[in-house]
């Protein structure tokens, strides 16, 4: 039977991608249905209990700047907050928070249940309704059919998921959850390229069996950072430390002597694992010269005794896992409460997607999260928001939107996936972005909130706060530009006490702030330049904008040059065999990828600058050279 009411957008899956997709579509006023196999696991952290990190924290801030959920949820659930790379420049500083799994899940579910235009329904999906190469609905395991104008697939590791512990394996979407086998079969029938990937998780340890007295503590930052531009530190629950232990030669001997029982090394697992989150087996074998590896013991929550040992992801048999755990300092009597495991699952080649994350072959069908070959909650959330907003726009007969590489890490993520594809789980790093100085955590709202407002993602409260911040930045910069001190002025001695070289000529507040030894905090304690802004976010922007003004202007010039190529569009139906002068390799790659622009074509492996020049000349001769607005 068909459900009596039609929907604009259906989201399949309630993980980090699915929840952001559902919230985005509903915020934009579209009637949205979130289908999940279990309402109690909405927003579940399947692996490590943490949000953020290098590159990842940037994505969370961008999701927040566009009105998303993740940053608000972690502000209510984070039990240890830190700034990584705090001593480095603002481009690579990143926020990370340890999470209480239960509080995080509660925050996500509460937000979903209070979101207008959103209905949640518990049933596994087994089929899609496709008519004339367009998706028009979904079918659940009890045969109930839902109609919609767009469908977003955010199914994580559930598609034909297979869990491995030692040489034993069984079907599962994650520990304790069933896989989605019928949906996997259905998707394999569609004209989509499919592959297998693998990820893993470590055993969980009973905290009561660990001797923390012999371990080093790791505390959070002070003052405590905040993830959401709308948040404050008073929202954070009780803060707790993490602990550090290490593997040793005994640990490594145990692993080496049991490699024949590892599903990876025995050839049982065919999927490729994440390069930047390797299993402990991989670390021991790949870095054979290392006699130890650092392991972080991270609490899973304020009401849980479980500890997540970050760094020993493994699929070795349970008896070997016990030996590994008990070989480390402080863990000699430790008990495992959940075994570690590896999981293999289907993913679909993201090169078959438009930058909006809509399929090139099935109209109205969007993909987000691990199904696209990524790893990580943050990467999933960012894709979910983008897919959700574009599904909503499609259902309202509006053009899709995707950020450029120069606009957001989300733009880098999507462009990398859609242009280059991936053969291993893709993780975001700051090093993947060409324009890191422009794409900082601290200015995510300045880059994206106005766009989010135009798209219908940003509510009145956030918009008012954003405009107040803009006014504070502009007013303070004008004040510092117009406030001067001369070498002969009475205040000069007070200013000189904070400088490595005394004033030799008249200087404005901005001139002084550009000096390496001067900070905004110091400057605004000096008589001519007091008082400081009470808006800490605006104060941070003033300092960064002034200190890095020259570098930022230079990078903006680079972006404008790059945009000329990025905005030169390529016809979707162009057969590159028509372009004389291109090599067979370049023709094959361009016909395979079907890039949307010259900029995208230039990032395809094997497409040379010479080939791009030939293509530009040919387009001009054919009268096909056109640029987007």
Curated annotation (Swiss-Prot):
Disulfide bonds: none annotated. InterPro entries: FAD/NAD-bd_sf, GIDA_C_N, MnmG, MnmG-rel, MnmG-rel_CS, MnmG_C, MnmG_C_subdom, MnmG_C_subdom_sf. The keyword Flavoprotein applies. One of its GO terms (biological process) is tRNA methylation. FAD binds at residues 13-18, 125, 180, 370. NAD(+) binds at residues 273-287. Keywords: Cytoplasm, FAD, Flavoprotein, NAD, tRNA processing. SMART domains: GIDA_assoc_3. GO terms for molecular function: flavin adenine dinucleotide binding. Its main location: cytoplasm. NAD-binding protein involved in the addition of a carboxymethylaminomethyl (cmnm) group at the wobble position (U34) of certain tRNAs, forming tRNA-cmnm(5)s(2)U34. Homodimer. Heterotetramer of two MnmE and two MnmG subunits. Belongs to the MnmG family. This is tRNA uridine 5-carboxymethylaminomethyl modification enzyme MnmG. The gene is mnmG.
């Amino acid at each position: 039977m068909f459900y009596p009411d039609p929907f604009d957008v259906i989201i399949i899956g309630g993980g980090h991608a699915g929840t952001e997709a559902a919230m985005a579509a509903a915020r934009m006023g579209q009637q949205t249905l979130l289908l999940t196999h279990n309402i109690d696991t909405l927003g579940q952290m399947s692996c490590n209990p943490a949000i953020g990190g290098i590159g990842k924290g940037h994505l969370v801030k961008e999701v927040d700047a566009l009105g998303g959920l993740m940053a608000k949820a972690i502000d209510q659930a984070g039990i240890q907050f830190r700034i990584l790379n705090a001593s480095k420049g603002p481009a690579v500083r990143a926020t990370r928070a340890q999470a209480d799994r239960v509080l995080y899940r509660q925050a996500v579910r509460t937000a979903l249940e209070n979101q207008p235009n959103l209905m949640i329904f518990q049933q596994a999906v087994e089929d899609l309704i496709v008519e004339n190469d367009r998706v028009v609905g979904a079918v659940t395991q009890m045969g109930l059919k839902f109609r919609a104008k767009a469908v977003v697939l955010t199914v994580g590791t559930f598609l034909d998921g297979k869990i491995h512990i030692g040489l034993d394996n069984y079907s599962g979407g994650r520990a304790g959850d069933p896989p989605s086998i019928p949906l996997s079969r259905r998707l394999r029938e569609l004209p989509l390229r499919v592959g297998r990937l693998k990820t893993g998780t470590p055993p969980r340890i009973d905290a009561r069996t660990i001797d923390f007295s012999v371990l080093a503590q790791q505390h959070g930052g002070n003052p405590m950072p905040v993830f959401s531009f709308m948040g404050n530190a008073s929202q954070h629950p009780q803060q707790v430390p993490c602990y550090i232990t290490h593997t040793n030669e005994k640990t490594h001997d145990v692993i080496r002597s049991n490699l024949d029982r590892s599903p990876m090394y025995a050839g049982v697992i065919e999927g490729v694992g994440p390069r930047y989150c390797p299993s402990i087996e991989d670390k021991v074998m790949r870095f054979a010269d290392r006699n130890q590896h650092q392991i972080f013991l991270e609490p899973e929550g304020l009401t849980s005794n479980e500890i997540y040992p970050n760094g020993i992801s493994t699929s070795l048999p349970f008896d070997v896992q016990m030996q590994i755990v008990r070989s480390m300092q402080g863990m000699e009597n430790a008990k495992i409460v959940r075994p570690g495991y590896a999981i293999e699952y289907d993913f679909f080649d993201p090169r078959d997607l438009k930058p909006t994350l809509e399929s090139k072959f099935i109209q109205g069908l969007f993909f987000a999260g691990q199904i696209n070959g990524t790893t990580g909650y943050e990467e999933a959330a960012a894709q979910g928001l983008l897919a959700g907003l574009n599904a909503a726009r499609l259902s309202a007969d509006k053009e899709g939107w995707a950020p450029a590489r120069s606009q957001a890490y989300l733009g880098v993520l999507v462009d990398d996936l859609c242009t280059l594809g991936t053969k291993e789980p893709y993780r975001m790093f700051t090093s993947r972005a060409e324009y890191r100085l422009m794409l900082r955590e601290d200015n995510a709202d300045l880059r994206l909130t106005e766009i989010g407002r135009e798209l219908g993602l940003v509510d009145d409260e956030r918009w008012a706060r954003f405009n107040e911040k803009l006014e504070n930045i502009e007013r303070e910069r004008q004040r510092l530009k117009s406030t001067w001190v001369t070498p002969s002025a009475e205040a000069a001695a007070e200013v000189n006490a904070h400088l490595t070289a005394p004033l030799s000529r008249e200087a404005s507040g901005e001139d002084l702030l550009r000096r390496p030894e001067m900070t905004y905090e110091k400057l605004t304690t000096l008589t001519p330049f007091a008082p400081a802004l009470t808006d800490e976010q605006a104060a941070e922007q003033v300092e960064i904008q002034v200190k890095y003004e020259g570098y930022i202007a230079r990078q903006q010039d680079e972006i404008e040059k790059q945009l000329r190529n990025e905005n030169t569009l390529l016809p979707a139906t162009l057969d590159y065999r028509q372009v004389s002068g291109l090599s067979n390799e370049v023709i094959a790659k361009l016909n395979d990828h079907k890039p949307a622009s010259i900029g995208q074509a230039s990032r395809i492996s094997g497409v040379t600058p010479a080939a791009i020049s030939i293509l530009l000349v040919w387009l001009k001769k054919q009268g096909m050279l056109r640029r987007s607005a």
